[in-house]
């Protein structure tokens, strides 16, 4: 029996879900409220209600070899970190290559998703949609929610006394598009996340003065890592993940802080996190430290209160004559079409098994794709989630008991608070999470077997970048080109920067990095053992 699956949203997670449904012989129907695919990465010159919004100058934080769909590498000449136009070009090309567009109903808003009266038997859902004022209802065998979590802005105005008296402009970062209108102005950005830092750095070229107010600080990383290679090609590896999770906590914490401070000392710039050992997702910005050095951006603590024209900070200092306050304070996840009983929340924590399945449903026919966050790329994460979810919907894979799922959720919540902080309940360890999901569908690489049968590939898989191709080496959805894609990933990385050839291209020497990391680890294990 063909199962009809409703997919809500045609961003990257929606496209991954359509493709996975087709691979499993399911019948997908995707509802997209806008007139195009791409979701977050489809730029519009004005913010639209109910849609994610990005600014004109945004660039990806993951490099192309780490963020592609696992069987569709980016073209060789695409830059490693790309603007929204280039990424949208790739997304459209992927959708056309996989013939996904015909399964999407554009300009269609999902207004209601409810369990049918016989849900405990059939697992079916009633879905109501609206297009051009006309409502329609249909029955679906399963639902995959792919609407993202960058839609509903979080503006904690109640946390800032006096804000209602402030006479200048005040808006969320989702409404920011470009710096032109703020030329010569004095701007306060609240929030030290990716958007806040990008906007502040960009405004600092034309504004009179820019200040960033941060409650807790943040690590700021560069996209350019050791020897000029993309950060994630060296940072997100199985070997590093192994060391991070197996070394004593004191050594792992020291190593993490040392990596974060490799470019500059954060305490000297006012950026140092209150708890520097938390693995909270860092900010990626190549320009912010230079703008601080040049004096065009200043970092300040939390705002104590506002006056009509100024902000008074908790350290007693004041920023006067403010023209604009931009809240780069993140987003809240919300599903207005969904009854609150479907995705339950405890103490502001989402109770989803592996960040995907509500554990209490009688039938496993509902999945949320793309909600979890990690220090890794979104596209391969959503691709793997969708592959597992569609196998669960089809019945090829089964979920454990409610008790087992709740115990897993409780355990993850405790670990996440320890590793990522109280507020980062959706964060996860990228390599560990990807391997966990891959193991459910038989797609996790067998490293030991690879070392015995294909040592050249094994070295790249374990010590090199944990690139998406690894999760198409075996199992359902296996891609015959995965091995070659892994062995040639550095060629595609170096291609767009090699526009003036001055010698042989230098790929990173895996064993040099291995030796360096291994030596450091041994030295500190020895020191640790001497001290205990």
UniProtKB/Swiss-Prot annotation:
Pfam families: FMO-like. It catalyses: trimethylamine + NADPH + O2 = trimethylamine N-oxide + NADP(+) + H2O; N,N-dimethylaniline + NADPH + O2 + H(+) = N,N-dimethylaniline N-oxide + NADP(+) + H2O; hypotaurine + NADPH + O2 + H(+) = taurine + NADP(+) + H2O; (S)-nicotine + NADPH + O2 = trans-(S)-nicotine N(1')-oxide + NADP(+) + H2O. Its cofactor is FAD. One of its GO terms (cellular component) is endoplasmic reticulum membrane. It is found in: Microsome membrane; Endoplasmic reticulum membrane. GO terms for biological process: taurine biosynthetic process. FAD binds at residues 9-13. It is a single-pass membrane protein. Liver. It is an enzyme of class 1 (oxidoreductase). The keyword Membrane applies. Its EC number is 1.14.13.148, 1.14.13.32, 1.14.13.8. It comes from the Eukaryota. The chain crosses the membrane at residues 512-532. PANTHER family: DIMETHYLANILINE MONOOXYGENASE. Belongs to the FMO family. This is Flavin-containing monooxygenase 3. It comes from Cavia porcellus. The lineage of its organism: Eukaryota, Metazoa, Chordata, Craniata, Vertebrata.
């Amino acid at each position: 029996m063909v199962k009809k699956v409703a997919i809500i949203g045609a961003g990257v997670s929606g496209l991954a879900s359509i493709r996975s449904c087709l691979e499993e012989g399911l019948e997908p129907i995707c509802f997209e409220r806008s007139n195009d695919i791409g979701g977050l990465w489809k730029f519009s010159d004005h913010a639209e209600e109910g849609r994610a919004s990005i600014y004109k100058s945004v660039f990806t934080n993951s490099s192309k070899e780490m963020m592609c769909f696992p069987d569709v590498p980016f073209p060789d000449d695409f830059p490693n970190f790309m603007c929204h136009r280039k990424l949208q070009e790739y997304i459209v090309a992927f959708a056309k290559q996989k013939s996904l567009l015909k399964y999407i109903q554009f300009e269609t808003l999902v207004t209601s998703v409810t369990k049918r009266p016989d849900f405990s038997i059939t697992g079916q859902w009633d879905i109501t949609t609206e297009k051009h004022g006309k409502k329609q209802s249909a029955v679906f065998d399963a639902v995959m929610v792919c609407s993202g979590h960058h839609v509903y802005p979080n503006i904690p105005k109640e946390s800032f006394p006096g804000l209602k008296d402030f006479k200048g402009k005040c808006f969320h970062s989702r409404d920011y598009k470009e710096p032109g209108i703020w030329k010569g102005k004095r701007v306060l950005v609240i929030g030290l996340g990716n958007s806040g830092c990008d906007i502040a750095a960009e405004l600092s070229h034309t504004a009179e003065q820019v200040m960033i107010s941060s409650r807790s600080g943040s690590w700021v990383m560069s996209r350019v890592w050791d020897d000029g290679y993309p950060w994630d090609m060296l940072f997100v590896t199985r070997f590093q993940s192994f060391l991070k999770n197996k070394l004593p906590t004191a050594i792992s914490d020291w190593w993490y802080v040392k990596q974060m401070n490799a470019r500059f000392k954060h305490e000297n710039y006012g950026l140092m996190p209150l708890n520097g050992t938390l693995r909270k997702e860092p900010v990626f910005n190549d320009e912010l430290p230079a703008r601080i050095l040049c004096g065009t951006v200043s970092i300040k603590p939390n705002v104590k209160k506002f006056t009509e024209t100024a902000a008074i900070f908790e350290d007693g200092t004041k920023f006067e004559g403010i023209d604009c306050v931009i809240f780069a304070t993140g987003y809240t996840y919300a599903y207005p079409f969904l009854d609150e009983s479907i995705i339950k929340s405890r103490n502001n924590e989402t109770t989803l098994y592996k960040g995907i399945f509500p554990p209490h449903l009688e039938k496993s026919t509902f999945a949320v794709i793309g909600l979890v966050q990690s220090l890794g790329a979104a596209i391969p994460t959503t691709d793997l989630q969708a592959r597992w979810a569609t196998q669960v919907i089809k019945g090829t894979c089964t979920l454990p008991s409610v008790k087992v799922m709740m115990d897993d959720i409780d355990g993850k919540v405790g670990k996440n608070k320890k590793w990522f902080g109280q507020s980062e309940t959706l964060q996860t360890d990228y390599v560990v999470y990807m391997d966990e999901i891959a193991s459910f569908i038989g797609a996790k690489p067998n490293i030991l077997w690879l070392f015995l049968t294909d040592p050249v590939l094994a070295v790249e898989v374990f010590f090199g970048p944990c690139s998406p191709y690894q999760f198409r080496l075996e199992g359902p959805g296996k891609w015959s080109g995965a091995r070659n894609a892994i062995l040639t990933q550095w060629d595609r990385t170096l291609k767009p920067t090699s526009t003036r050839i001055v010698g042989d291209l230098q790929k990173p020497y895996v064993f040099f990095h291995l030796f360096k990391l291994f030596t450091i680890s041994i030295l500190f294990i020895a020191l640790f053992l001497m001290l205990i």
